Curated annotation (Swiss-Prot):
Catalyzes the conversion of 4-hydroxy-tetrahydrodipicolinate (HTPA) to tetrahydrodipicolinate. NADP(+) binds at R34. The active site is at H135, K139. This is 4-hydroxy-tetrahydrodipicolinate reductase. Its EC number is 1.17.1.8. It comes from the Bacteria. The gene is dapB. SUPFAM superfamilies: Glyceraldehyde-3-phosphate dehydrogenase-like, C-terminal domain, NAD(P)-binding Rossmann-fold domains.
Length: 246
């Protein structure tokens, strides 16, 4: 299986390239970056599967090109703003090929999301919710894709279990707010913290990444799943490569 990386010259693209070179079951194909000599169309044409580690500014262009020449995609970058049409384009592409949407491919992040949904269903409106995410100063997007995903998970759980609307940055009395903070400092690979806080107690879920290799290894697990399972077209999450049922 020939793997092409979109964003091949970035931190994650470089890490994944090195990991792929060390494996016998995958071949590193031509990649794309803003400074590469390959066009986006030629990279898509000359690979069996694509991994996107670029940025949200490229997403619209990438999906337009993929809809002209569908290839399986691991979409591992932050989605553009909700006003974009990316969700619709993901669904369109997933009608033809497998699309794995995973802004965070680590096992710890997946478990944190599942626990967050559980706690959101347990704690009522007496508990305020705060999300804090910290990354290295070179990370361009804020809020991170993982933090945005956590917000969606919490809002869905609150609406389902408590019939209560939650959102970020709302000022209506009928809407509960999720406090959300982002920081870009130093060389921190990634930290996400969710706190449920009442007048009497607090419970906190924190996931900290010490090495970016954990993300590249997560992508490799998803590639193994694509290679071994040959899944049908559809939209999938990062759990497909984790072999977990929690």
């Amino acid at each position: 299986m020939r793997v092409g990386i979109i964003g091949c010259s970035g931190r994650m693209g470089t890490l994944l390239s090195n990991l792929l070179r060390a494996t016998a079951r995958f071949t590193l194909g031509p990649g794309f970056s803003r400074t590469s000599t390959h066009s986006l169309a030629s990279v898509i044409d000359n690979n069996d599967v694509l991994v996107d580690f670029s940025s949200s500014s490229l997403s619209e262009e990438l999906f337009r090109a993929l809809l002209s020449n569908p290839k399986p995609l691991i979409f591992a970058t932050t989605k553009p703003a909700p006003s974009s049409s990316i969700d619709e384009k993901i669904e369109d592409l997933a009608a033809y090929v497998p699309v794995v949407v995973c802004p965070n491919t680590s096992l710890g992040a997946y478990v944190q999301k599942r626990l967050a949904a559980l706690l959101a269903a347990v704690f009522d409106d007496a508990y305020d919710i705060r999300i804090t995410e910290v990354h290295h100063r070179g990370k361009k997007d804020a809020i991170s894709g993982t933090a945005n995903e956590l917000v969606s998970i919490l809002c869905d759980a609150k609406k389902k279990e408590w019939q209560q609307e939650y959102r970020v940055g709302a000022d209506s009395d009928s809407v509960k707010n999720i406090e959300l903070h982002a920081s870009r400092v130093g060389n921190i690979s990634g930290e996400h913290e969710i706190a449920f806080i009442s007048d009497k107690e607090q419970i906190t879920l924190r996931h900290t990444v010490f090495s970016r290799e954990v993300f590249a290894e997560g992508v490799l697990r998803i590639l193994d799943w694509l290679l071994n399972e040959s899944p049908p077209p559809g939209c999938y999450g990062p759990e497909v490569g984790l072999k977990v049922s929690v």
